[in-house]
Amino acid sequence: VLSPADKTNVKTTWDKIGGHAGEYGGEALERTFMAFPTTKTYFPHFDLSPGSAQVKTHGKKVADALTTAVSHIDDLPGALSALSDLHAYKLRVDPVNFKLLSHCLLVTLACHHPADFTPAVHASLDKFFSAVSTVLTSKYR
C-alpha cells in the first residue's frame, strides 16, 4: 500500500523526469532485454538491437502508461484496466516480466537522477512499480 509520503515521492520524481519519460522507458526496456534475454520472446517481430526505433517506441508506451498511473495513483485498477486486459488476455505476458522491467526502470532512473534517488524515493518507486505490476497481473487469476 502506498503511503501519502510514497505518493508524494512518486509524483515528485515523475515530475522531475518530465519529457524524458519516453527516453527512459526505452532505455529500461533495452536494459531488460539485455539483462533478461527471455523477455525477448514477447517481441519476435521487433528489431531488438541497441538503439532500435521499435524498442524506443514501445518504451515510450510503457512510460506513457506509467504517467497515466502516476496521474491516477489513487485508482490504479481503474486507470490500468484496459492495459491489464491486454496483457492478460491477448498478449499473455508472464507476470514475472513486470518485476524484471520494474527493476530495470529503477536502475535507469537511478542512473539519470542519482542525487534525487534517495533510499526513500527508491522504496516509494519500488512500491509504486509493484502496485502497477499487481494491477497488470490481477486479471490473470
Curated annotation (Swiss-Prot):
Pfam families: Globin (PF00042). Red blood cells. It comes from the Eukaryota. Residues 1-141 form the Globin domain. Keywords: Acetylation, Heme, Iron, Metal-binding, Oxygen transport, Phosphoprotein, Transport. GO terms for cellular component: blood microparticle; haptoglobin-hemoglobin complex; hemoglobin complex. PANTHER family: HEMOGLOBIN FAMILY MEMBER, HEMOGLOBIN SUBUNIT ALPHA. Involved in oxygen transport from the lung to the various peripheral tissues. Belongs to the globin family. Heterotetramer of two alpha chains and two beta chains. This is Hemoglobin subunit alpha-1/2.
